[in-house]
Design a protein with these regions (language model features):
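N-terminal and secondary-structure boundary signal
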Residues: 1-369
């Protein structure tokens, strides 16, 4: 694309983070991208129901974004949650300290898996799909609640075993696709591009606010190595904010397939040379992150990309799917969390300023609302 995109980036600290988020939304021109007078959906990111640093939307990110939207006149807000076969949504919003914020500001919380909240309706995109029409040959269904509303994504800066990085574009995955979305993993990059095209059709505005106060290196989106980086980002260009995040982590954004494909499709700007950075200068930063390998990534590679991928339909489209779900749950929740990641979380709470702020949220619920 020839039009330059704008991504706002601010350095922050716990003492000022809520005010910094309010300033960030203004700096990123949120009111240019979100239609006035429309309900604005907040789509948080629960990659793991446990409060693993860098894996999930932070409570200060949620509270700061709500405050910033209120400042700009967006008072009709809601939150939409989704579930996966391995994540407990209710546990996640509780342990990650979202519930007190929802309650304090009277924010309606809806669940895309509850028929009383929304229904999955047939949808035929106007633009040609790269993958979803092949993955769902009987037709695509998306939640009816999403039509005609703004959406603000709340991802974090982190690596991902399937997509190298994950951020604004990947955050649409849980909201727009059903619990069968694991069918898309072989074509995950193309799927993310399709989802961005769909968002541009159904939403009155799309915006992203990304937390990089503690960022995630390694085998994300759950078993990460948290690193304190003290940055927050926002943009109305979902491709550009993911590109800036990827560059900060040390990756070539145009070398990441979903970013390159979206750039080439004209859905946003993925080339850092065509992105304007507003706020604090982070153009020289490169953190040298590396996704690396673990048991879960090896199993995922064999399932979706390796020589055994021909077994996909047997493994994931039949009741046999409950076995890999059990393996994943056992590995993450019964082995990794108690033996390793919980200790990392407790050390982060004890030894970092952001961990101590998280403790303050546990004690107070919210800070300014």
């Amino acid at each position: 694309m020839s039009t330059r995109a704008k991504v706002a980036v601010l350095r922050t600290k716990p003492e000022s983070v809520l005010e910094d988020y309010r300033r960030l939304l203004k700096l990123a021109d949120a009111d240019r991208f979100l239609a006035p007078g429309k309900t604005t959906i907040l789509k948080d990111n629960i990659s793991w129901h446990y409060p693993m640093p860098s894996a999930n939307t932070t409570p200060w990110q949620l509270e700061g974004t709500i405050l910033g939207l209120h400042d700009l006149g967006y008072n009709d807000l809601s939150c939409v949650q989704n579930k996966t076969v391995v994540i407990d949504t209710y546990k996640g919003e509780d342990l990650n300290q979202y519930v007190p914020i929802f309650r304090k500001c009277g924010l309606p919380v809806l669940y895309n898996f509850k028929e009383s909240d929304m229904k999955w309706v047939p949808f035929e995109p106007k633009v040609k799909m790269l993958a979803l029409d092949r993955i769902y040959p009987k037709g695509l269904r998306i939640p009816d609640y999403f039509f005609g509303k703004n959406i603000v994504h709340l991802p974090t800066v982190k690596c991902h075993i399937y997509t190298t990085t994950t951020g604004a574009m990947k955050n649409a995955f849980g909201g727009l696709l059903s619990t069968h979305r694991h069918y898309t993993h072989t074509l995950i990059h193309e799927t993310l591009v399709d989802l961005l095209a769909i968002q541009k059709e159904i939403h009155t505005g799309v915006f992203a606010v990304m937390d990089g106060t503690t960022v995630g290196d390694g085998q994300g989106p759950r078993t990460l190595k948290p690193v304190v980086k003290n940055v927050i980002l926002a943009s109305g260009d979902q491709v550009a904010i993911d590109a800036v995040s990827a560059k900060l982590m040390g990756f070539d954004p145009m070398g990441i397939k979903y970013i390159r494909l979206a750039h080439e499709a004209g859905l946003g700007v993925g080339d850092p040379k065509e992105i304007e950075l507003a706020g604090d200068d982070v153009s020289g930063e490169s953190w040298g992150f590396d996704v690396g390998w673990n048991f879960h990534r090896v199993m995922g590679w064999l399932s979706w990309y390796g020589p055994t991928r021909f077994l996909q339909k047997l493994l994931f489209h039949t009741p046999i799917v409950y076995f890999p779900i059990f393996v994943s749950e056992t590995y993450h929740d019964r082995i990794r969390w108690p033996l390793k990641e919980r200790k990392i979380y407790e050390q982060w709470k004890r030894d970092t300023a952001w961990g101590r702020l998280f403790t303050e949220y546990q004690q107070k619920g919210c800070l300014l609302i």
